[in-house]
Amino acid sequence: SKSFKVEPGVTYPITVGGGGAKGPVARPAGDKGSPGSNSVFSTITSAGGGYGAGGSQQPGTDGGSGGSGGGGGYDANGDGGAGNTPPVSPPQGNNGGDASSSAGAGGGGAAQAGTSTTSPAPNNANGGPGGDGSPSTISGSDVTRAGGGGGAGYGGGANPITRAQGGAGGGGQGAITNEGPHAGQKVAATAG
């Protein structure tokens, strides 16, 4: 890690940013989540998280790039967003996972990439977990931050899905809705 010399009596601007937002399950076509905002300390900037992709056969279902990338959306096999964007050393985050036709992928975390998904039986497809965040002592105690969000999933009939877990350090779970003639459950992809 790099050091930053703090001078007594000098005021330094600080902005606390955030992760990207999840993408929607249903249409309108091409809709997606929103990117996160940057964190800034004086001359040092850490990029906000990439947005989560939408699902339900929408175009543009790739996750957004950012400090960590958002997870790809299901139905259209969306790719995960690139982490560490723009590139810096040491890296500020990891890639989002790639999605299958049945389940969305997890968003990337500061310490770990989001989990990609495969295409299992259509009535039992869990989303990918989010990547774990990294521990930080900036507040004076050891706290894990910047976890990636859990991905999207589909389950119907007698095969309900299990919520995809967010990564350690604040990664959110996907929200579940019931849709369709078989009361299938779909989870909105969350961001990294």
Q: What does each model-identified segment do?
A:
Residues S1-G192:
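Low-complexity, glycine/proline-biased repetitive segments and flexible coils/loops
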